[in-house]
Amino acid sequence: KNGYTVDIYDKEDRLGGAIYTGIPEYRMSKIFLDKVFASMKEDKNITFHFNTKIDCERFEGLRKNYDKVLVATGAQIENTYGFEPGNGLYAGLTLLYDLNIRGNHEYYKKYKKAMVWGGGNVAMDCARSLVRIIDDVSVVYRRSEEEITANKSEIRDARNENVKFNFLCNVKRVLRDESGAVTGAQLIRQELGEPDSSGRRSPQSVPGSEFNIDADIIVMAIGQKVDLSELAEDLKITENYRTTLENVF
């Protein structure tokens, strides 16, 4: 609209980013998204480069070849708090990608009892996706329902779909059998103290309140963070969406 010609680089084979890979079909139709993105492809001022992962070398080339570079990669690094995914332990976005893009719904039917750890919209997407495959799904969240960050409508819909909630609990240990397969989690009850930087009351573990729950699949949906080091070691965010590199936004 401002007269620029634009090149878009994406590591996936399609447009949409997290809208396409992370939002389940029951929330947003892929047919609708395909129609929206098809109209973008018709714009002669936009060129798309799919299946293209940008590393430091390619990023330096982009800086040399373009007047402006806009980085819109999102928060792709999933928090795991030291727990190693595998054998029934999954990261939230990885699960959603597996279901939404690869369509591996049949694979997850082998599980009987699911636990989703987290209280944001990604956690709700994971729980509501799994309850369509697995009958027994519960959410574990360290604060109360009052502090939960997921949309209230998502919580209501999850409950209507028989997702159970365990508030004021946090994961202390992931339990596994001799083969390494997930068998459940050791939780510890929480109590709320003074508000933290987010304005929500800070959870504190209650000593001696540990208890175990059974689960053969656990999904960690406990936040993501931005990592720009793959593009440039000195790339940092400053004020007004600018960065420490000239003409990079």
Where are the predicted features?
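Rossmann-like dinucleotide/flavin-binding elements
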Residues: K1-Y9, H49-E60, I77-N79, T94-K152, ...
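Rossmann-like dinucleotide-binding cores of NAD(P)H-dependent redox enzymes
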Residues: I8, E12-E42, A127-R173
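Short acidic, glycine/proline-rich loop/turn micro-motifs
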Residues: A18-G22, F83-E84, S198, L231
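Feature captures the FAD/FMN-dependent oxidoreductase FAD-binding
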Residues: D34-E84, R173-Q186, E191-E194, I217-V219, ...
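Short, conserved active-site loop motifs that form the nucleotide-linked donor/cofactor pocket
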Residues: N45-T47, V163-K164, V248
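Flexible, membrane-facing loop/turn or short amphipathic-helix motifs
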Residues: G193-Q204
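A short N-terminal beta-strand-loop micro-motif at the entrance of redox/enzyme domains
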Residues: S202-N212
